[in-house]
């Protein structure tokens, strides 16, 4: 249980309640038996699910307080729920389009008393409000180009979209150049190691309001993918 022990140590360093993480993992394992919620189980649930989510979110938010965060396509709650258990003072919204996962996330919210987490059955590109969130994250949801087209309108001015990517991140940024050229942004790439694997945080800071065509419809996003 190497990675579970790492989460225990992580919680001790930050005065977080590890028992909440155990309850969360138990809920995932219990409900995953009957509903296909995630492919993670056992040790990979602690590594790829919990620990990686904590490292990703802390790097994305830089330990800021009193900020508004959006997690797109959260599934069973990665990366938002582990971070919410660690940092209870930040407001977190989750957009998840699949009903069975929405139901599970609402159960987790209730069982773990996550009052500052809100779950919506929602696709990002269908949400018309703009300039809302200080940090928008998405893990294994879509390419840089897709995420910009679908969700960059949700990022507040001076806020950031932060996407975790592997070694092919340069190709994704290159493929997104046409969309990036329509925006005024600052793109910064931070390299960091997750469990001996090289990962990259692509941070896209909004410096000006998005043009009117944002967000693109899912039909247009698929056409340009």
From Swiss-Prot:
Predominant localisation class: cytoplasm
Binding site for S-adenosyl-L-methionine: 73, 78, 124-125, 139
Locations listed in the record: Cytoplasm
This protein's GO CC annotations: cytosol
Enzyme Commission number(s): 2.1.1.-
Enzyme's top EC category: transferase
Record keywords: Cytoplasm, Methyltransferase, rRNA processing, S-adenosyl-L-methionine, Transferase
Stored Pfam families: GidB
Keyword Cytoplasm: yes
GO MF terms held by the record: rRNA (guanine-N7-)-methyltransferase activity
Family: Belongs to the methyltransferase superfamily. RNA methyltransferase RsmG family.
PANTHER family in UniProt: S-ADENOSYL-L-METHIONINE-DEPENDENT METHYLTRANSFERASES SUPERFAMILY PROTEIN (PTHR31760:SF0)
Family matches, as HAMAP family: 16SrRNA_methyltr_G
General function of this protein: Specifically methylates the N7 position of a guanine in 16S rRNA.
Protein name: Ribosomal RNA small subunit methyltransferase G
Organism: Mycoplasmopsis synoviae (strain 53) (Mycoplasma synoviae)
Lineage, broadest ranks: Bacteria, Bacillati, Mycoplasmatota, Mycoplasmoidales, Metamycoplasmataceae
